[in-house]
Amino acid sequence: MSIRLICSDIDGTLLQYGKKELEDEIFEQIRELHRRGILFCPASGRQYTSLRKLFAPVADCCVFLCENGGVIYKDEQCIAKNPMPRALAEEIANDLWTRSDGQGEVMLSGQNTAYLMERGLGMLKRIQFIGNNYQIIHDPSEVPEEITKVSVYLHEGVESYTERFVPRWKEANCAVAGPYWIDTTIAHKSIGVRSICKTLDIDLADVMAFGDNYNDVSMLDIVGVPYIMDGAAAPLREKYPNHTPRPEDVLREFLKQN
């Protein structure tokens, strides 16, 4: 096994919740990995615009897995896209909106724009905080392009709604994506990683990946070297033997030893 690709979830993994900028160390590590012929992949539910801004100093050294695998970018070009069936996306969006007791706001993701159905509960501020392109809509039918992901933002937390939505939309890979988000998508991170590996002729055994939540499981399950964050839920820490508080700690040792 020779690591050729390193994938990392962002929020809750490489970027702790509430932080807006990455540490300088990760940029130095990505540059050194690139010099050694190892590609770094931010693997996130965020859109491309947000990820490219976040990784601006090293963006040309990265391949970007966006929208949980719904869209893949390399060298500023979309190299793969996995949209949801339109009728299913609209049905899910309407369900998340109407069955969240007035406590949820809905985001429908296009290739590089977030379409927001908001109630003034905080979603808009969060989307502005991470730097997404966005547009306010009032109905899912207003989205003028293919939809890659449908999410609900629950401003009081996901706990009361996980059992309501996750089993119901299992066909759309419904999963908790953070303290306030539940995501649905036909794609998932493993589809994105497989697309990257196929395009770049990389064996899955030669991939290292980091994650902290249930929407990272599909990615962690297929790579040769998966790491779960120390702050992840107990079932995830039990599932994966490799734990770390920070991806940078693992990468620092990896670069020393290789």
Regions found by a protein language model. Name each.
Residues 4-19, 220:
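Asp-based phosphoryl-transfer active-site loop
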